A protein has these predicted regions:
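Predominantly extracellular beta-rich ligand-binding scaffolds that present long acidic/polar faces
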Residues: 1-3, 48, 56-234, 247, ...
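Extracellular beta-strand-rich solenoid/capping regions of secreted or surface-exposed proteins
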Residues: 1-32, 37-60, 81-84, 231-233
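Bulky hydrophobic/aromatic "packing anchor" residues in well-ordered structure
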Residues: 8, 21, 95, 202-209, ...
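Short, solvent-exposed loop/turn elements at domain surfaces
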Residues: 16, 214-215, 246-247, 292-297
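Active-site and glycan-interaction determinants of carbohydrate-active enzymes
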Residues: 33, 38-48, 223-270, 278
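Predominantly extracellular/luminal cell-surface or secreted proteins
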Residues: 37, 148, 178, 286-290
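A short, flexible beta-alpha/helix-coil linker loop
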Residues: 41, 152-153, 291-294
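Right-handed parallel beta-helix/beta-solenoid
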Residues: 223, 276-297
Length: 297
């Protein structure tokens, strides 16, 4: 989905679809390998002004290897689960540069709003104009994911909370998160990222977006073209993933959003992308000088 993109684009004749993707069936559906862009649920006659990218109304939805960006809504601009849903399972997915137009005090104020049963592994949630996740109720299982650079002010600051909500069951382990509520006590099992370039805990990427929130047209990247949130080799995300903590078969993975195998470098990276600057794990051959004909030489 990164190099050869299948795009669901909400732009129609100068306007926008309210929701680019809507899951309105009580069964199961899979979104795999799509670029979901340019939904706008914040204006017009939209009855539900949340979920510009994906509106999950009913049933169970699996989102795999997708990029959800540049969507707008009053709240929950990227993805919204409503209380009538069953389960959301999201893996190897990037949710970036989505914009909320509502007030920070309102419900659903986040790029991704979750209810009931939400499970995420190896996702990158970044540069959204709102906190990354609001887990409103139910349970949230979050592993090996990045939440960084999500802010309601437009300027990234250390105090920006990346994840909020009142979910009753939380299992949040081995993620890289900029900031979270103090009472959640996340830092013994997660990495706290820095916003200071040059800091060892600053997550540098190959070709990230420059700014926060949706853009009106074109690309907002230093190298041009679509954003690529692949970590550089100096990033704290590299070789920091841990698949052993994931007991849910729905979340099991062995490759990233590009199909790059986790064996590269010896362990997976945190987030949807694997760094491509590392060599695959191979055999180690030892060459010793002056063999003495003993078992040790």
């Amino acid at each position: 989905p990164v190099d050869f993109r299948t795009v669901f684009d909400g732009t129609l004749a100068g306007g926008n679809l309210y929701h680019v993707v809507t899951m309105s069936d009580d069964g199961e559906a899979i979104l795999d390998g799509f670029h979901i862009v340019n939904g706008n649920a914040s204006t017009g006659s939209s009855v539900i002004k949340t979920g510009g990218g994906v509106l999950h109304e009913y049933g169970t939805l699996y989102i795999r290897n997708c990029m959800i960006e540049n969507n707008v809504a009053t709240n929950g601009a990227g993805i919204v689960m409503l209380g009538t849903t069953k389960k959301l399972v999201m893996t190897n997915t990037v949710v970036n540069n989505n914009t909320n137009t509502g007030l920070a005090s309102e419900s659903f104020y986040s790029a991704i709003t979750l209810e009931n049963d939400a499970r995420l592994n190896h996702c990158t949630i970044i540069h959204n104009n709102a906190p990354g996740i609001c887990a409103m109720n139910g349970q949230l299982r979050l592993y090996n994911s990045v939440l960084w650079g999500n802010t309601s002010t437009g300027t990234i600051a250390p105090e920006d909370i990346q994840i909020t909500g009142e979910a009753t069951t939380l299992d949040i382990r081995n993620n890289a998160i900029q900031n979270a509520p103090e009472e959640w006590n996340l830092w013994s099992e997660n990495i706290q990222l820095s916003v200071v370039q040059g800091d060892p805990l600053y997550p540098a990427f190959v070709n990230p977006t420059r700014n926060v929130g949706a853009v009106s047209s074109g690309y907002d990247t230093p190298l041009g073209g679509p954003a690529r949130f692949e970590p550089t080799c100096e990033s704290p995300l590299v070789i920091a993933g841990d698949e052993s903590i994931v007991g849910d078969p729905d979340l099991a993975l062995d490759a990233d959003i590009t199909g790059h195998n986790f064996a590269v470098g010896g362990a997976p990276d945190i987030g949807a992308y694997e760094a491509t600057c590392l060599n695959p794990v191979g055999s180690v051959l030892y060459v010793r000088s002056g063999p003495a004909g003993t078992a040790s030489s």
